[in-house]
Each structure stands twice: as structure tokens, then as C-alpha cells.
Amino acid sequence: MAPPPKKPRRTAERILEVTLELFNRFGEPNVSTTLISAELKISPGNLYYHYPAKDELINSLFTRYEEALGQLLHAADDVRNVEDAWLFFHMLFELIWQYRFLYRDLNDLLSKNRKLETQFQAVLKNKSHAVQGVLDGLSRGNAIHIASREAEPVATAMVVVLTYWLSYEYVRDPRRALEPESAGAALMRGAFHVLSLLMPYLDTASREHLLKLVGTYQN
């Protein structure tokens, strides 16, 4: 008689869920494996069985982020107007928020985790390619008029804002900026400031529509 099928590794999944919550709330450097096991009400040995080192938790979460990001960045090809762009960048910020510990502690993580050191370069490259795709789509839709020599530095500036916006929010208000109740306003501000870099190149109707979109979200 064949053995019954194995149950899903629910414990491993739950470990990642709780680890992500703790990393996002307190910052990765401030969360120990002891705290994670205590929060889960499991023994440190059980945690070690599934994830023998803290780096394995970080790497597993990063892999999930990287996969979700790859799927989302494909949507850049569908951008044709400022509303499409607004939705794209807002969704991108929502994903960044979901894994905000990576951006809150980015420099620290890169300095001590070899996988992140190498793979985050690919993340930046993929973001840059997607943002350039957004600019190309807006140009094809006649929403922006930008010379090719200006498009690359503008795209780079947009990626910089995408990458460090949550760090800026954290510096502005360390006690509350990365709490869940702050998410809506932070994401709206981030999306607007990314798109505001296109203001000099937007046609009049697109510029007015962007400001209207921001006003709708603020209200």
C-alpha cells in the first residue's frame, strides 16, 4: 500500500510569513531567530530544521520578492498614458511596501549577504529596463515628448526614487513611516514623485490628468 501523500510544508510557509512581518516591523538587523521562534511558538530547533541560518530566511523572502517583481515589471509594456503609468508605479510601490525591510535596511543587507549583493544589481537593471519601457510607451501614446538623450538619465532618476523612497519616508518619521497605517499616503507620495520627474515632458492634458489623479487619491 502506497504511503499517504505528504502534507504541505505549512510550518515552513508560516515561518516565512511571520519572519516577513517581523522584518518589516522592526528591521531585519533587530530580529533574531530566537525572536522568530518565540513569535511562532515553536522551538529554535524546529526553526533550524526548516531554515538553518537567518540568511536562508532572507534569501527565501528575497526570491519571492524577485519573482513577484519580475511578473509585475512585464506590465510596463502595456503603459500608453499617464493613468496607466500611475497604476503601474502604484502597484510597484505596493510590492516594495510588502517587502519593505529589503529597502529599509538595503545597505546593511548588501554588505553582509552575497546573494543580495549580486541579485539586487539584477533587480535594478530590470527596474531600469521597465521604466524605460514606460517612457517608450508614453512616447508612443504621445503623452510625453522627450529626446532620446534625456530619456536615460530621467529613467535612472525614476529608479533611484523607486529604490530609496521608503528610506526617505523613514528618515522623515522614523516612528511611524513604515507602519501599516502609513502605507496609503507613503505609496501615493512615492508614485507621484516618480511621475513628477516626467512633468517637463508631459503634454498639457496628461499633466493635468496626473494632478487630478493625485488629488483623487489624496481625497
What are these regions (language model features)?
Residues 96-118, 132-136:
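Amphipathic alpha-helical segments used for helix-helix packing
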Residues 74-101, 155:
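Hydrophobic alpha-helical connector segments
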Residues 4, 11-18, 154:
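N-terminal positioning helix adjacent to the helix-turn-helix/winged-helix DNA-binding module
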Residues 14, 22-60:
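Helix-turn-helix
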Residues 63-69:
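Short, basic, alpha-helical segments at the C-terminal edge of helix-turn-helix-like DNA-binding modules
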Residues 167-219:
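C-terminal peripheral helix-coil segments that are non-catalytic and often amphipathic
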Residues 73-77, 103-110, 138-142, 169-176:
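Secondary-structure edge/capping motif, primarily at the C-terminal ends of alpha-helices
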Residues 115-141, 152-167, 185-200:
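Amphipathic alpha-helical packing segments from all-alpha helical-bundle domains
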